[in-house]
Amino acid sequence: MCPISTALFVIAAILALIYVFLTWNFSYWKKRGIPTAKSWPFVGSFPSVFTQKRNVVYDIDEIYEQYKNTDSIVGVFQTRIPQLMVTTPEYAHKIYVSDFRSFHDNEMAKFTDSKTDPILANNPFVLTGEAWKERRAEVTPGLSANRVKAAYPVSLRVCKKFVEYIRRQSLMAPAQGLNAKDLCLCYTTEVISDCVLGISAQSFTDNPTPMVGMTKRVFEQSFGFIFYTVVANLWPPITKFYSVSLFAKDVAAFFYDLMQKCIQVRRESPAAQQRDDFLNYMLQLQEKKGLNAAELTSHTMTFLTDGFETTAQVLTHTLLFLARNPKEQMKLREEIGTAELTFEQISELPFTEACIHETLRIFSPVLAARKVVTEPCELTNKNGVSVKLRPGDVVIIPVNALHHDPQYYEEPQSFKPERFLNINGGAKKYRDQGLFFGFGDGPRICPGMRFSLTQIKAALVEIVRNFDIKVNPKTRKDNEIDDTYFMPALKGGVWLDFVERN
């Protein structure tokens, strides 16, 4: 055999071995009598992870649409790893709530190393088992109704500054309008840094602190992290000796340094120690529980990073939908009135809260939940075929698909806040049916939900009271989700015009 033929034979043999390695497990679900979504070598059932032509949630949505009427469970593959997707709200509720013990953890924990990425590793969303349970018990009292109420005057003060900032920016606004996400991120950075740390990020000035820029980078799409999760699925042992951080090193270092300085200032200031805020609560917890500096910093950093981005996204999209729907904007304006609202009054704004919940339905912070099986259990398909799941298996809940299924939500792409009014059962009705997961559900429901809702409502009250919000032509008319960002966001950005009201 000539050298060229030998080389071609070797290459062909190597390619064949790679193909077998990538696809040999694709019969996993078929052998167990479970229907399987179409899968491809290397990319599994979700090719958009690699093509980046659209958000991967649309791959999940298509699988859901294909099987929802015939099957309650369907086999999928994350690269070459078999996973199971549920297609019924009953199973979604079972996994989140009624059988929580069997689906206790989130898949993200598999790809997170506490040494490489201590911020993410200490996030309640990522923590597992008893560590999560202990952390949840520690953090929840720091977000009590009394502490949220104590922070409300700070929120009002920041909201007044926010309105003035929008007013100044509108005077200088180009024809493309204002970037609503940037505006809202300035607000959440300012209000959360003040409420939590007692400092100002100077977000509404011409010379903001570096905190504003770093906040914008917190959840930038990290291709390195995505690629690492793909490799880890192809070859799981890599997680034992190599890991990649979701957060850029300089971003993590900045916030760690900021936290250390804030803690030092707080300890040295008797007056600041009287604030009933999250940082003082954490300092008290440190003394009580003996937390080390790294744990204290990570605890508080988690609250900051989650609050900055998630709250800003929800506020951005709520403003978008109010701008698209002038009648709903007018209803909200009528509800809030003209007088300054107390904490008790802002907590009782049913239509405003319904607008936020409807926004969370359309742009849910978690588009698909990936839960890790923690106790042996069994799921049964519509045809009666059951499959036994073992600890370590992953089950996917297609949150975005359930939120947009016309079987459960009439005209799912339309903004209809009345769905979530208490007279119609409110958000609780949909949660109990396994159809709404805006803040998650069950024991792992977002612990900062009350705080986040208060900050969003406070901002909406001041903005809607002072401006008519209009959609700038630069903003797309549909709800397509961006494929380049870690958090769900409208593709192309949200560009709005704020017209001063008399």
Swiss-Prot record:
Q: Which Pfam families match?
A: p450 (PF00067)
Q: Record's CDD domains?
A: CYP6-like
- State the top-level EC class: oxidoreductase
Catalytic activity, EC: 1.14.-.-
The protein's required cofactors: heme
According to its UniProt record, where is this protein mainly located?
endoplasmic reticulum
The entry marks the following residues as binding heme, namely C446
Membrane topology term: Peripheral membrane protein
Mind telling me which InterPro entries this protein's record contains?
Cyt_P450 (IPR001128), Cyt_P450_CS (IPR017972), Cyt_P450_E_grp-I (IPR002401), Cyt_P450_sf (IPR036396), Insect_CytP450_Detox (IPR050476)
Q: Name one GO cellular component term.
A: endoplasmic reticulum membrane
Write out the annotated subcellular location.
Endoplasmic reticulum membrane; Microsome membrane
What are the alphabetically sorted keywords of the record? Endoplasmic reticulum, Heme, Iron, Membrane, Metal-binding, Microsome, Monooxygenase, Oxidoreductase
User: What GO molecular-function term can you cite, just one?
Assistant: monooxygenase activity
Q: Record's family? A: Belongs to the cytochrome P450 family.
Q: Describe the task this protein carries out.
A: May be involved in the metabolism of insect hormones and in the breakdown of synthetic insecticides.
> What protein does this entry describe?
Probable cytochrome P450 28d1
Species name: Drosophila melanogaster (Fruit fly)
